[in-house]
């Protein structure tokens, strides 16, 4: 097997896997190699997204559930077997759901997750593709990301996150654009961007220093410190922390109370709170996406992503 190019993620990881297992006894190495390659190859089974436009109409998706009841629109990450990792289609579905929620009869909009995780963030398999298509994949990814974040910047109603478990990456950074964040005491908040050679997103390079101060923001965004729910509350990212045993009951009782408040007053108040910052947020979002677009095609990024996939697959053995 010839050595593959740096952006042929699955084949390159397979190459590394074969070399890494070379020191094991022959039969053990053979079995482990087959298991590892099978795991890596499953990463590439999803249909290619590289040529799909970000303005494509979102399809109905079982991975994003949208319900509306008692004045509350609930948007649920519903991919528990993948720790609610966000696929390309889920990004489109969320944008579609937010557009509908902005004009429906609900008073507030709530995000939460199914299962143990709130969301493990961007599904890195979104960026696995053939070497010849990497530029298209990166361009599409950053275009969708910019539109996705702008949807949160523009959303006119109160936006609440009900963080039922661990949150990673963009599932954390986007929280700074919410109006309230309620967390279970078992939730954690992790932004391992430097580990993955990625640029922070969702206006976090501006909002995190504003919320928690520059040194604490750097601890998360540069050095990848994982925060407990209590630490996130102390730093201002989380509004309130609830015991896991009473989390759902207490939070939803609170939310039903919020849904009885004046919708017009809350919309006007949110507009006044956000209006002086909105243009700044658009600018920061554009700058972060431009930096990501410039960064992603580099070999260092490809190597970090490849190593992540290799470690993840090897851990399953």
From Swiss-Prot:
Report which superkingdom the organism of origin falls in.
Eukaryota
Q: Which catalytic reaction applies to this protein?
A: a (3Z)-enoyl-CoA = a 4-saturated (2E)-enoyl-CoA; a (3E)-enoyl-CoA = a 4-saturated (2E)-enoyl-CoA; (3E)-nonenoyl-CoA = (2E)-nonenoyl-CoA
Where is the motif named Microbody targeting signal mapped on this chain? 315-317
For this protein, what is the EC number?
A: 5.3.3.8
Location in the cell: Peroxisome
Tell me, what's a Pfam family for it? Answer: ECH_1
Residue span, ACB domain: 1-46
* Start and end residues of each stretch annotated as Disordered: 40-60
On tissue specificity, the annotation reads: Expressed at high levels in the kidney. Also detected at very low levels in the duodenum, jejunum, ileum, heart, liver, lung, and brown adipose tissue (at protein level). In the kidney, expression seems to be localized mainly to the proximal tubule.
> Which chain positions carry the site (Important for catalytic activity)?
201
Main localization of the protein described in the UniProt heading:
other
Question: Per UniProt, which keywords does this protein have?
Answer: Isomerase, Peroxisome
Disulphide bonds in the chain: none
Gene3D superfamilies attached here?
1.20.80.10, 2-enoyl-CoA Hydratase, Chain A, domain 1, Lyase 2-enoyl-coa Hydratase, Chain A, domain 2
**GO BP annotations listed:** fatty acid beta-oxidation
* InterPro entries cross-referenced by the UniProt entry: Acyl-CoA-binding_protein, Acyl-CoA-binding_sf, ClpP/crotonase-like_dom_sf, ECH/Chromodomain_protein, Enoyl-CoA_hydra/iso, Enoyl-CoA_hydra_C, FERM/acyl-CoA-bd_prot_sf
GO CC annotations on file: peroxisome
Tell me a Gene Ontology molecular-function term this record carries.
fatty-acyl-CoA binding
Binding-site residues, substrate: 120-124
Read off the domain note: The ACB (acyl-CoA-binding) domain is truncated and may be non-functional.
The record's comment on protein family reads: Belongs to the enoyl-CoA hydratase/isomerase family.
For this protein, the record's PANTHER family field holds: ENOYL-COA DELTA ISOMERASE 2, PTHR43684
Q: What does this protein do?
A: Catalyzes the isomerization of trans-3-nonenoyl-CoA into trans-2-nonenoyl-CoA. May also have activity towards other enoyl-CoA species.
Put simply, this protein is called Enoyl-CoA delta isomerase 3, peroxisomal
Organism for this UniProt entry: Mus musculus
